[in-house]
């Protein structure tokens, strides 16, 4: 839960001092910008939260996958600012943490079947979300020096 709790602040720290242009830049061709990474984690947070709620509060509700690239294409049309994306992530993460903290050990052991991955428990999602956070935080850590070193657009 430590990773889940600290990720919003890590986003803030890693984006500090970067311009809107830098947050939207693609220093590695074909890879997401920092803004897109945070948007992706925000979309994922929504999907993971729904799955966890189904596991915790419904009986035998099937869990479905999602196409991250299609969600990203839709998000790009919305033209959301980085601050709004970050605030949306923080609000959803607070709700997710509240849900996990309110769950008993028996609740966290409840399961549902994912259409791609099979049986998953609510506690599996704590680890899955943390790993997803770490993966993308490391991606931002690698991108940041490239953005700082590049000439401003």
Where are these regions (language model features)?
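Acidic/histidine-rich alpha-helical segments that form the ligand environment
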Residues: 3-8, 12-14, 72-109, 129
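Short, contiguous alpha-helical
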Residues: 24-68, 97, 111-153
């Amino acid at each position: 839960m430590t990773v889940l709790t600290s990720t919003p602040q890590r986003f803030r720290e890693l984006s500090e001092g970067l311009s809107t242009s830098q947050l939207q830049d693609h220093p590695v061709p074909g890879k997401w910008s920092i803004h897109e990474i945070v948007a992706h984690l925000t979309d994922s947070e929504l999907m993971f939260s729904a799955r966890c709620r189904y596991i915790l509060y419904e009986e035998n509700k099937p869990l479905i996958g999602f196409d991250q690239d299609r969600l990203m294409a839709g998000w790009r049309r919305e033209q959301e600012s980085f601050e709004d994306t970050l605030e949306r992530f923080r609000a959803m993460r607070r709700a997710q943490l509240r849900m996990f903290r309110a769950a008993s050990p028996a609740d966290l052991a409840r399961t549902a079947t994912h259409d791609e991955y099979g049986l998953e428990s609510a506690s599996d999602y704590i680890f899955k979300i943390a790993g997803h956070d770490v993966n993308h935080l490391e991606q931002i850590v690698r991108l940041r020096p490239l953005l700082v070193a590049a000439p401003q657009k």
